Amino acid sequence: MSASPSPIGAAAGLDHLQARRDEEVVDSEKDALAHDSHAVNSGIPHPTATAPTIGIPIVPISAGRESSAPEEKISRSSIAASSDILHNPPSEKSISSAVPKSHRYKKSKFNFLKSRKKKEEEEKKNKEKEKEASVLPPVSFFALFKFAAPLEIVAMVFGLLLAIAAGSCQPLMTLIFGRLTTSFTNYAVIVNQISQGGLTPETAAALQAAKDDLKTQSGHNALYLMAIGIGMFLATWLYMFIWNVTGELNSKRIRERYLAAVLRQEIAYFDDLGAGEVATRIQTDCHLVQEGTSEKVALVFQYAGTFVCGFVLAFVRSPRLAGALISILPVIMICGGIMMTAMAKFGTAALDHIAKAGSLAEEVIGSIRTVQAFGKEKILGNKFADHIEKSKVIGRKGSIFEGFGLSIMFFAIYAAYALAFYYGGILVSHGDANSGIVINVFMSILIGSFSMAMLAPELAAVTKARGAAAKLFATIDRVPAIDSANKEGLKPDSLHGEISFENVRFHYPSRPSVPILKGFTTTFEAGKTFALVGASGSGKSTVVSLIERFYDPVSGVVKLDGRDIRSLNLNWLRQQIGLVSQEPTLFGTTVRGNVEHGLIGSIYENASPEEKFELVKKACIDANAHGFIMKLPQGYDTMVGERGMLLSGGQKQRVAIARAIVSDPRILLLDEATSALDTQSEGIVQDALDKASRGRTTITIAHRLSTIRDADRIYVMGAGEVIEQGSHNELLNNENGPYAQLVNNQKLAQEAAAEALQEDDDIDDLDDTVLGGASSPMQEKNGQLYRAVTGRSLASIAMDDIQAKRAEDLAAEDKIPSSFALYARLLRMNSADKLIYIFAFIAAICAGMVYPSLAILFGKALSDFEIQDPNELRQALSRKALWYFITALAAAIVIFFQSAGFSRAGWDLNGVLRKKLFTATLRHDIEWFDEDRNSTGAVTSNLADQPQKVQGLFGPTLGTVVQSCATLIGGCIIGLCYGPLLSLIGIACIPILVSGGYIRLKVVVLKDQRMKKLHAASAHLASEAAGAVRTVASLTREEDVRRIYSEALKGPMKLNFRTSIKSQCLFAASQGLTFCIIALVFYIGALWIIDGKYSTASFYTVLNSIVFASIQAGNVFTFVPDASKANSSAASIFRTIDNEPAINAESTEGKMLDHEHVVGHVRIEGVHFRYPTRPGVRVLRNLTIDVPAGTYVALVGPSGCGKSTTIQMLERFYDPLAGRVTLDGIDIKELNLANYRSQISLVSQEPTLYAGTIRFNILLGANKPMEEVTQDEIDAACKDANIYDFIISLPDGFDTEVGGKGSQLSGGQKQRIAIARALIRNPKVLLLDEATSALDSQSEKVVQEALDKAAKGRTTIAIAHRLSSIQHSDQIYYFSEGKVAEHGTHQELLAKKGGYYDLVQMQNLSRQ
């Protein structure tokens, strides 16, 4: 890649480099919006080469995208003063009693603000300390290649020598350029002398000799230029190819070793890592190392070669002139440093607010149902907008500094032109130099200086690689305490399966101050089934982890058949154990492949495929999985999707059980294997577990005590010790014991009622309810007639209409509007900056016209060297120097307005787009969010990424594009004016010259993007394994994963090898051809000068205005990716903004209800429904439910029967395909949506709290503005929710920060705050969607009391898996396959002995 002395090349390169770096950050950070913010990428522009430019580099292009700071997430630290209490909450009553009421919640605002400020300072200091502690020193440059083979090292050294040779070509070219200039000047002098003295035979002979000499010199020098071009082509092709291939090989080895090292680490290693850190290392850091060890290393040496050769040549030719010209370097460095510091300051501050906005967006979009249920889209949208507005204000300030810094820096560059001609004129007039030497030295210094600037971004890539490698190598070199790669250890020939713990003490390495096991001693006899029960944190799962040897005890010993497990070979130990966890991880392969993973390390590992399949099939039959597997589209060869996402929870569990038992292990560990399942799925899975545990040592952990009643022995754990043990019946005999208390918390009454309810009529076939309303006799008749004619129900027809509309929407998304239409709309959207855009456009055009205009000045300056009188020569060049100085001042002014104007407008547009996109996103209905493309991750990623990409084009980049176009057009016009014929030749060569920029884009700029895409599949595989490291370790899949990963890396490597030969050849050809074209123009120009068609001044004017302007204009291709990304991003943003959801909470249409007159009578009539994303699944089928005002109704049934869908229908998250939902007899579709939802409150299974105070989160439920809610109303809601005493016991009371997603509170505390939020609006209807299912028994009891209190006097509809919480309901509806199978009171349904009765029996713990 060639260095260019031109600032236009420099600045354009800066834009593309900034874009590239922005994209790296956005790609690596956008699926995570809450990480520490790094320093903003800004500062001194680093010019990038596009072609060997030797003309006058005059036009600057504004700095790149400093203002377009990428999205990065800011992690939110916990508030120090309250975190201890929140994480380790003592008894709430004891806390409450310890705080006198007179002092509770009476803190002054001053004290609160003071304490908040102090906390923020402490938080900042802690973050700085953590950051310092986590920083590793970068590895040495040579360490980057420590895995390279000797032959590769030889090839790389040879490539570096070629890179240095390629870098030397441009300074050598200036030498040729200087010699040609001298020849032209000498010829012009002779012509002038002859013209002054008249034509005589002697002068005619002298003139002919001068012509012959010029023709000969021009021919020779043109050949030299072509030779340099050919040499540049060969050297560039070879070194780019060599370093590209060796970089890929080196990266492949590092990736393989890093993943191998990760998989061999003990589990404690992962406890200290962030959730996505391993994935980030694999996807991002390995890419950074590859980028910094491939051709960028060679480019560093090329630019260094250019710098050294240029300065050496300059000082050899004229030490005095060279010494004067190097004065520009410190000025450029100082100005760039100041600008970098200022931009980093403003950029980091802007990033802080953008990151906070991104974090808020993730929370809000991740809980969109809660947001819409409470109608708080506007409040949360305003909070988001506040952060964006603050970032915009800071970005505007930074824009001024950016423009000012660039204008000063480029003024210094242009002033150097004036110095060159002024001082050069003095030297020539004194006979110390000639025109060729002045041009040679000037261009050599300029090329050398810019090569140093261009070296910086490539050197930055190497520096980043060193930093990234430090993290990778730290893991690669780390020897874990528990090493799965260690082949040592005993492998006994036989195993009985007896496990014993002897005085085991343990704490997690990440929490050394929290003891988990305290002298734990017990024995699990071989072949028996044991159960561990107890409260959360009592040490149950830790026991399983110690048996798997995920951790080693701090003291004591764990033995297997009397041997310390630390003496056993680790892989052998884990291969004897089958583990099924609460959330089993399946890998992205087939059902068969997942089960076969359980055969690794067994005697069947290398069995034939047929034999393996028989084992897999048997294991699946034992696990009750064979039946559903055979119903899958491809049976055992069906892909299960990422993490088994295409299977239900129960299906995943059964496949995991089959995987655990397929190798017939002697030990089976079941860590809450059924707790996440509904009762029906739990029953099926529990049967599979009971069958699988026969003849094995089985240890089960369960919250649902019904699953372990048949265990041989049950251990009740508390505070890391066994506090009670025995069989189920033995433990129940101790009525006051801890186990009996746990049972009582889940106990159901067993008294049966005398009479049973009549079964509901089967209404399976009544699908013809008329769409959208109650069924009148005429409508029913019409519906039946329609079915008779078409054979299809109205619900089915409605679903077809929805599907057709979705297909139309998807087709429309593939159509991107014209660029003109998009850009016009974007400019209209940012119309507030209309004047700024106008001034910036004018400034960019003026900056673009500077280059061709000064081509005239350059040509005239060179013609001045023809003057023979020293004084006159010096005066003429001094005048040209003055004009250069004036040009420098003018250019500095237009550069300031261009850079500052476009940068500011870019920030403003970014802010407008973010706010409008976020507001439009929240306006969409739930159906929109259900689509995979609109998942929380995808939407938050788009919110972070898309406005950024539009800003990337409509900020400084837009100015650069306008400037480049102005340069090209202006150059052609001036060239045609000064020399039409030569201009036409130059214009004919424009496609070739401009293509250099395009080829550079394809080869260099897009190369990194292409390689990232090629590595996406292998990176996903590695991330999947790293994200399921416990599963990988328990299955001893480490070697298997390494093998698959290595195979996956071969594809990108082979493809890169094949494409590199062609692409690098094209790139090298574009560099070499430029020299050849310049040689052609020079030679033709010399011939026409000899023929008298052109003067020297005209020739150089045409040469600079067209040829070199075309080269620089080729830089516009650098921004093709920006334009493409901006177009697609803008189109996507406008689609989101323009989309009108069918259920629009912002709509002002519909009847308004008076809250005081709402009774709360809810009725669902003949509702049919299918989710649009799953049109083949009928969810609700003619569902009819009547809930009288003020009653408590419960919905129960197996998973997938339609209970939660019913709640969502009541919230009007969806509309039924047929039938209707009414409130007080009015179809809810006729009501104003926002007003309707204000009558309802929802408490879900996983309550969402937002970053902010407890007060803020409670007030989100209010129906009136927050400032109008009184403290008494807040207190009353909190007392009803059983959370008031806890809140006022906190140091900051209601002003305590809850952390992101309520992270500073326990599950029970979050749930009760959510209940208070639901109650503060005094709802007429309360919806409870499994509000206690995720809690342990103790928390469930407290929350259930709050719910019972909250339900009094309100229409309440509750869903619960734990039937103990709803047995006193006024009416219980038992769902089956989307319809009501039976309903009645608890006692009435028990008497029926139907589906509800079966559920009760499965959870009945007190039956003997």
From Swiss-Prot:
Residues the entry annotates as binding ATP: 534-541, 1197-1204
Region (Disordered): 1-103
Organism superkingdom: Eukaryota
Protein name: ABC multidrug transporter MDR1
Organism this protein belongs to: Cryptococcus deuterogattii (strain R265) (Cryptococcus gattii VGII (strain R265))
Regions crossing the membrane: 147-167, 223-243, 296-316, 321-341, 408-428, 436-456, 838-858, 882-902, 952-972, 973-993, 1072-1092, 1099-1119
Domain ABC transmembrane type-1 positions: 157-464, 838-1125
UniProt subcellular location: Cell membrane
